Design a protein with these regions (language model features):
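Glycan-recognition surfaces
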Residues: 1-68
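Catalytic cores of secreted or luminal carbohydrate-active enzymes
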Residues: 52-100
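Flexible loop/turn segments at secondary-structure boundaries
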Residues: 34-35, 65-67, 73-77, 126-129, ...
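C-terminal beta-strand-rich structural cap/linker in extracellular carbohydrate-active enzymes
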Residues: 159-194
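Solvent-exposed beta-hairpin/edge-strand motifs
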Residues: 136-153
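Generic recognition of flexible, low-complexity loop/linker segments
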Residues: 43-46, 105-109, 163-164
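Carbohydrate-binding surface patches
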Residues: 57-60, 65-67, 101-140
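Hydrophobic, well-ordered secondary-structure elements that form the walls
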Residues: 119, 149, 171
């Protein structure tokens, strides 16, 4: 799986409308190979690794080809494969690129409709990774606005944020959807304050 980070980053300059970086099938769930090509087995990836795999494929706009037997999906795997925010990355994201690569930390960014942005941060290392960064550290453009942030995998709204403060388990990821916060023009603030006195 680690090799795919470098491979998808190298392919990205060639990704455009009508061309997709094909990272191969998603090795998630119950894998039932064609007769003569090995024994049936469950994915050898941990749950965190499966999330990382799916997040990377989606934000890089690889086709999401499920390699599992769909009739044998358990509830946990089905939840992974049907996450609406993750599917939107793959189907609606534009301008995706690897925004940062420092040691075990790799971050990708893509733009979404309605002026939203997505930021995926991966820990490719074998030990926990502490990430305390302003959004601008990943891309200067992200530092020019105020954002309402949603953790896409947890389905949790994190409120107004200017950066990331998280610890990622080995081989795990954090997928954030950033929505622009509509701020009142500064010239209106004194007027509103006076009306509420």
């Amino acid at each position: 799986m680690k090799d795919q980070f470098a491979r998808l980053a190298a392919w990205q300059p060639f990704a455009k409308a009508g061309n997709w970086p094909d990272a191969d099938m998603l090795a998630i769930g119950e894998l039932k190979p064609h007769p003569g090509y090995g024994e049936p087995r469950s994915s050898r990836l941990t749950y965190d690794e499966q999330k990382t795999l799916l997040t990377l494929w989606a934000i890089a706009k690889s086709p999401l080809i499920v390699g599992a037997n769909l009739t044998l999906l358990d509830a946990k795997t089905l939840t992974l494969l049907t996450n609406a925010d993750v599917i939107a990355l793959d189907q609606e994201g534009t301008g995706e690129f690897e925004a940062k690569h420092e040691g075990a930390m790799i971050a990708w960014r893509t733009s979404l409709p309605k002026e939203r942005e997505a930021l995926a941060i991966f820990n490719t290392g074998d030990t926990p990774l502490s990430v305390q960064r302003d959004f601008a550290d990943f891309d200067a453009d992200l530092g020019t606005r105020h954002w309402k942030v949603t953790d896409a995998w947890a389905g949790q709204e994190l409120g107004r944020q200017r950066g990331v403060d998280a610890t990622l388990a080995p081989h795990s990821c954090l997928l954030l959807v950033l929505s622009p916060e509509k701020l009142l023009p500064e010239k209106l603030l004194p007027k509103l304050h006076k009306e509420h006195e």
